[in-house]
Amino acid sequence: MSTARVRAAVVADAPEIARIQRVTWRTAYADLLGEQAIAALDESIEQHWAEAIAHPATTVYVATEGEFTVGFCVAGPAPEDEVANASGTLPEDADRTGLIATLLVEPRWGRRGHGGRLLADAARGLRQRGAERGISWVAESDSASLSFFRRAGWRPDGTVRTLDTGERRLRELRLTGQLDLELAG
């Protein structure tokens, strides 16, 4: 049996992270995002991921199974515009709130605990940086991701936003939860 683990990404992981994003968006999110958004994931996305990995304020984690990279997660401090309520008011704990910006597992590697391990390690990393709670934005129609975060104890906090993908509008719910997670699946 292969060993599954999570580690901090290195710049050399950028091409594999970009591949996972492309495959996952095409396989799991085509109906949500539309072809135009997926087509925009050109070769420059690898450079974007290399820059994200090197950025000192965030940590990119990768999930591996044996020799394969199967998923990734990005975590860091929540920017003010991400943590503010709809009126723009910041909560008292804004400076102690972490953001799970992206968490993707390639669909063929799903249901093996990779997402849970990624979220648990990202939450641990955020706690080590002083965060006390986390937030993440999830498409309202993405029932699989909403269920995943609910199992981790995260819930919608009433804040919504709408993103324009170029050919459709995507309504997202902001989820919030504690960072003392010990998830394995």
Region spans (language model):
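Acetyl-CoA-dependent GNAT
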Residues: A8-V11, R19-G110, G116-D121, G125, ...
